[in-house]
Structures are given as structure tokens and as C-alpha cells.
A protein has these predicted regions:
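Conserved Ig-like domain signature around the intradomain disulfide
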Residues: 28-30, 41-43, 79-87, 91, ...
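Extracellular beta-strand/loop-rich beta-sandwich domains predominantly from IgSF
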Residues: 17-22, 55-101, 115-119
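Flexible inter-domain hinge/linker segments at boundaries of tandem extracellular adhesion modules
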Residues: 1-16, 46-53, 62-63, 89-90, ...
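Disulfide-stabilized cysteine-rich extracellular repeat microdomains
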Residues: 10-12, 27, 37, 50, ...
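Solvent-exposed loop segments of extracellular immunoglobulin-like
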Residues: 36-49, 134-145
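A short beta-strand segment in extracellular, disulfide-stabilized domains
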Residues: 21, 27-34, 125-132
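Residue-level recognition of well-ordered beta-strand positions that form the cores
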Residues: 31-33, 46, 70, 86, ...
Length: 145
């Protein structure tokens, strides 16, 4: 059977089953590699029980096979989405499975000013609050004059 399974992205090996954070709109390439095994393993990507790709590249000289999952544009629904890499070279044994979740930065969906429901007057104090929602991590709000 295959001995090792490793998932990596453009930044290197994935640790603790979650990618480093990617910006909304960025592209992401995940590579799942299997080493050893005779014959070399078939490698496939799954999400929620559905096959995404089972296109496997074989490198016999290095005793390795791999499959690449490319997401051209990350969207909000990819946040913490779990993708599974399955590695198998025999129907007699269950596949080796490695799961990876996608971490993301999300820009704010909305910024709103509160407290402007009356006319402003010179020399009179008015409190205005800026509320922001939909960002991850929470947005840093600053005021400029």
C-alpha cells in the first residue's frame, strides 16, 4: 500500500488540516501526493461525498503519484470548506484519506453610519457610530478628516 500522503498548497505543506488564510477572490492550488505503493496509488479529490477530480499524475522514477485541485477564485462559501484527498491502489483496502479545510480573509460586506438622523449644528457635539459586518477577521475601523 502507499506509505505517505501529503497535501500542500502554493505556500508549502498543509499543517493541522487547515490552509493558511487566503483572500477572497484569490486562487488556490492544492496538491495531494502519495509515496511508495505497488502499483502507484490513484489520487482523487472529493468534497461532501462528490468526486471533484481523479486525474492522477504518476512519477514512477520517484515512486510518487499526485493529483492537483485548482480553485480559480475563492468565494465566501469556500470559507472552512473541507476537501478530502483519497489515495488508493487496491480495492481490497480502504483508501487513505486526508482532509483539508480552507481558511480565508473576508472583506466587509457592509459599512454603515449610525447617529446621523438629525441635522448637524456648529459647536454642538454629535456621536456617530460606524458599524461594519461580514469581515473575517473583524474589520479595523478608522476615522479620517
Amino acid at each position: 500500500p502507499p506509505q505517505g500522503v501529503q497535501v500542500s498548497d502554493d505556500r508549502g505543506p498543509i499543517k493541522n488540516g487547515i490552509t493558511t488564510a487566503y483572500a477572497e477572490g484569490a486562487s488556490l492550488t492544492l496538491t495531494c501526493s502519495a509515496t511508495s505503493g505497488k502499483p502507484l496509488a490513484r489520487v482523487s479529490w472529493w468534497k461532501g461525498g462528490e468526486l471533484i477530480t481523479n486525474e492522477t499524475q504518476y512519477f514512477p522514477e520517484r515512486k510518487r503519484s499526485q493529483s492537483i485541485l485548482k480553485i480559480d477564485k475563492l468565494i465566501r462559501s469556500h470559507l472552512l470548506a473541507v476537501f478530502s484527498c483519497e489515495v488508493s491502489n487496491s480495492q481490497l483496502q480502504p483508501p487513505l484519506v486526508v482532509r483539508v479545510a480552507i481558511d480565508m480573509y473576508l472583506r466587509p460586506l457592509e459599512a454603515r453610519l449610525q447617529g446621523l438622523n438629525h441635522p448637524l449644528s456648529a459647536g454642538r457635539r454629535t456621536d456617530i457610530t460606524c458599524k461594519c459586518k461580514g469581515s473575517r477577521p473583524p474589520a479595523v475601523i478608522s476615522w479620517w478628516k
